[in-house]
A protein has these predicted regions:
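Solvent-exposed loop and capping/linker segments of extracellular ligand-binding repeat ectodomains
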Residues: 41-292
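Enriched but not universal
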Residues: 1-54, 58-61, 289-292
Length: 292
């Protein structure tokens, strides 16, 4: 590898299935030169879960974590400190970062592993798997039941998650339920690459994300019970959904999933899939329909 790296206006794509399917990570560069191994050069897929401060004096509070212990770094991973329930990290200033890792955490069916809440506006990026596998997160694609339930829910200072990597392809039940609910400032969702779903895996995941305009592409062809229920409810600015499902027979799999989205938009479906209904449980009323 060269001693530095350079990105132009191309988008970066990654594959989780040896090149069969590709997903954008949301990385775009304008041509600036970055020092090799700086955070700007590290692909998000291989970056610890990271909060980027958009204002001075940002700390991140951990709550609903029970006895779980997280670790965080404010010096790009050179040193790490422990963070327990009810504590906040050291503060950093605008443009600086706080990285997180954890392993062996206890998962609560009501609270997941806990909630991470920044004190000022912040973007969240990097690989979520550093909260499951610690330093060994790269290449990991399995998460457990309830793993990230409520992880960022109602954390109103989170303004961007588009560069957050959720690489799991083996999902647990309700693993992402309410993960981003009530994040009223995010506009673009992270990619969701899984093609095999688990019960309730995305239920209410983006509930009340009222600024969301770009939904993740949904590649799974067979839905699981409750898997998409309430997923985009009250996403009032959402105008485009791509869903490639061909079997939507599972119990409550699309219950109220598009209730409260924008009055007009475009729904992209699998070619030949004609079993969709119109309304809150199917294709939004008055939306245009296209085949993928």
């Amino acid at each position: 590898m060269s001693n530095n790296c350079k990105y132009y206006k191309q988008a970066r794509y990654v594959s989780y299935d040896n090149g069969t399917t590709w997903y954008t990570t949301g990385e775009y560069r304008k041509g600036e030169l970055y020092e090799y191994d700086s955070l700007d050069c590290i692909p998000y897929l291989t970056q610890y879960l990271t909060f980027v401060a958009e204002a001075d004096n940002m700390s991140v509070a951990l709550s609903y974590a029970n006895s779980n212990v997280f670790e965080y770094s404010v010096d790009d991973g050179s040193t790490w400190s422990s963070l327990t329930n009810g504590q906040s990290t050291t503060s950093v200033n605008s443009g600086e970062t706080i990285m997180f890792k954890a392993s062996g955490l206890t998962i609560s069916s009501s609270d997941g592993i806990g909630t991470l809440n920044p004190s000022v506006y912040a973007s969240v990026q990097g690989n979520i798997m550093s909260l499951v596998y610690g330093d060994n997160f790269t290449g990991q694609t399995t998460i457990s039941d309830y793993q990230f339930r409520y992880l960022f829910s109602s954390c109103l200072n989170i303004i961007s998650v588009e560069n957050l990597i959720l690489p799991a392809t083996t999902l647990g039940m309700y693993c992402y339920q309410h993960m981003f609910s009530n994040l009223t400032r995010i506009t673009t969702a992270p990619e969701l690459p899984a093609t095999t779903l688990a019960s309730g895996c995305y239920r209410s995941m983006f509930y009340n994300c009222s600024s969301l305009t770009v939904a993740p592409s949904l590649p799974a062809t067979t839905l699981a019970d409750n898997s998409y229920g309430y997923m985009f409810q009250n996403c009032s600015r959402l105008t485009s959904i791509t869903c490639l499902a061909t079997d939507i027979s599972a119990t409550n799999c699309t219950q109220n999933w598009v209730s409260g989205v924008a009055a007009s938009g475009t729904f992209i479906k699998a070619s030949g899939m004609n079993n969709w209904t119109t309304g809150n449980n199917g294709i939004p009323t008055n939306w245009a329909v296209q085949d993928a």
